[in-house]
A protein has these predicted regions:
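A structural motif
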Residues: 31-34, 98, 163, 191, ...
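Active-site acidic/histidine proton-transfer and metal-coordination neighborhood
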Residues: 59-60, 75-166, 173-175, 249
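A short, acidic, flexible beta-alpha connecting loop/helix-capping segment that sits on the rim
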Residues: 233-244, 248
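Acidic-and-aromatic substrate-binding clefts and catalytic sites of carbohydrate-active enzymes
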Residues: 13-18, 39-50, 72-82, 108-112, ...
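Acidic/histidine-rich catalytic cores of soluble enzymes
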Residues: 36-37, 67, 126-213, 220
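N-terminal pre-domain/capping segments
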Residues: 1-96, 132, 136, 165, ...
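A cross-domain feature marking catalytic cores of carbohydrate-active enzymes
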Residues: 4-8, 39-42, 66-71, 103-105, ...
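Generic structural signal for well-ordered alpha-helices
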Residues: 22-26, 50-54, 86-90, 121-128, ...
Length: 265
């Protein structure tokens, strides 16, 4: 399955809340030819969103894959709050037919100490249990902070949760100077999800996939070599101040065609 994540819509909205533009998101991504939609936790915090998402999913014949999630899991003082929030989000993922939760563990803006990595792992284990109760699989999403400094944060998590599933963001790996093909080969058996985005040689995000320099042909080969059978999600992003040259739906369509042609998915 090749789906899409709506970050590029959320980026300009208050609180990154995609709820006001859900109709546009489903319409655009249906037009683009993707196989499903990965929602964001911001939408699923609204108790009344479930019937609306179900209706949109039926109307556009576009399944909900799951949702992305982020919380400061390293901060033990926030654990009760995170548990309550995540339980509601995960429950709604299941209600709208989703089956994945791609979570980020939170950036401490510094190197986390061992006790914080312990707290982070404890929270992840609890969330994994809630996911399992709802038929949802948790995967670890990454930004730069999880994989910089020789993957310190990620390795700290995996040392504590050896069977954790991964959902790497390929572009953020490149941003952290982690070679994506090597990452796929090293962690292939754990990878159940991946976010796809492209960047130019100067590090600036490209408008659509195929307009940058990331070697997605090699990444596609690496995924096949490691028997990847999970989900890929196109997650476009624009640099600050960027003025799109085409409608977002066209960039998603170009990206979907690129993934099929170049990656073989």
């Amino acid at each position: 399955m090749v789906g899409a994540h709506p970050w590029v819509y959320a980026a300009s909205l208050p609180g990154y809340d995609i709820t006001p533009v859900l109709d546009r998101i489903f319409a655009d991504l249906s037009y683009a030819g993707v196989d499903g939609v990965e929602l964001m936790d911001t939408a699923l915090r609204h108790a009344d969103v479930v019937p609306r998402v179900r209706d949109l999913s039926r109307r556009y014949n576009l399944p909900v894959i799951g949702a992305s999630y982020q919380a400061p899991m390293w901060n033990r003082e926030r654990h009760t709050e995170i548990m309550e929030d995540a339980r509601a989000v995960i429950g709604r993922i299941a209600e709208v037919g989703g089956h994945t939760l791609g979570t980020s563990v939170g950036d401490a803006r510094r190197t986390k100490i061992a006790a914080e990595l312990d707290a982070q792992a404890e929270m992840l284990r609890k969330l994994t249990g809630i996911c399992a109760e709802n038929g949802v699989v948790l995967n670890l999403h990454n930004h730069i902070y999880e994989v910089r400094d020789d993957e310190y944060d990620l390795r700290g998590t995996l040392a504590r949760i050896p069977d954790a599933k991964l959902g790497p963001d390929i572009d953020w790996l490149v941003g952290a100077k982690v070679e994506p093909v090597s990452f796929v080969h090293r962690y292939g058996g754990r990878i159940v999800y991946a976010h796809l985005r492209d960047r130019k040689a100067d590090g600036v995000w490209s408008e659509a996939m195929g307009e940058g320099v990331i070697d997605y042909a090699a990444i596609g080969r690496a995924l096949r070599e490691t028997n990847f059978s999970g989900t890929l999600a196109i997650e476009l992003a624009h640099p600050e101040g960027f003025k799109p040259t085409r409608p977002l739906r066209e960039s998603f369509k170009l990206s979907r065609e690129y993934v099929r042609r170049v990656m073989g998915y």
